[in-house]
Amino acid sequence: MSTEPEASAQPLPAQQSAALFRLMTWLSPAFPVGAFSYSSGIEWAVEAGDVEGAASLRDWLDAMLQHGAGFCDAVLLCHAYRATERHDDAGLLAVAELAAALVTSAERQLETLSQGRAFIEIARKAWNSDGLGRAVAACGEAIAYPVAVGVVSASHGVPLPATLHGFLHAVTSNWISAGARLIPLGQTDSQRVLAALEPSVIATGTRALTASLDDLGTATFRADLASLRHETQYTRLFRS
């Protein structure tokens, strides 16, 4: 019997292992950015009857991913990452300002800016790196969540494709968690929704990698309206 390790048992190079460890940490539900308190308008969609079960939640999130905030945030993350990598302070500021402005409601702006601020704060205290302070300063006062993730990942040399797909997975999982608490859904149905959205997450990430800032835009009027209507919703659990 051979004592040689199989190819599948070969360890990852140290740099890849560190990048994977950091990415999984930053995008874990345990990373304290407060994502659990936001629903991106899903709470109003449930109240209005647009989302009432696993199938309608899947369809709603598929649209948000491919034609709404999911795609826009993915594109912004990519451009923030590349500007950080190039030390393009002017370009990074332009992306950060666009990301802060490109939201459909006051609550959605609160959602992305508060998470971005928390992400940067924790990253600088626990995961600081050479160049991170400069990149953060270049972003100005308002740093949206996807910009924050792009800046930190680029500063640590975590590959962009992995960062992007990890970010989309984390955002989608949080949306599903919100939907599960509101509808409500069981754990198995929630995982079925996530599994069904895998192709959409991959397709959105792949498209965002080659998209320009001119490609930004949404076609999810109902979801955008939901984020506006949530601001005056009488009874609610979430901040957006």
From Swiss-Prot:
Keywords: Chaperone, Cytoplasm, Nickel insertion. It holds the Pfam family UreF. This is Urease accessory protein UreF. GO terms for cellular component: cytoplasm. It comes from Rhodopseudomonas palustris (strain TIE-1). GO terms for molecular function: nickel cation binding. It is found in: Cytoplasm. Required for maturation of urease via the functional incorporation of the urease nickel metallocenter. UreD, UreF and UreG form a complex that acts as a GTP-hydrolysis-dependent molecular chaperone, activating the urease apoprotein by helping to assemble the nickel containing metallocenter of UreC. The UreE protein probably delivers the nickel. The keyword Chaperone applies. Belongs to the UreF family. Its main location: cytoplasm. The gene is ureF.
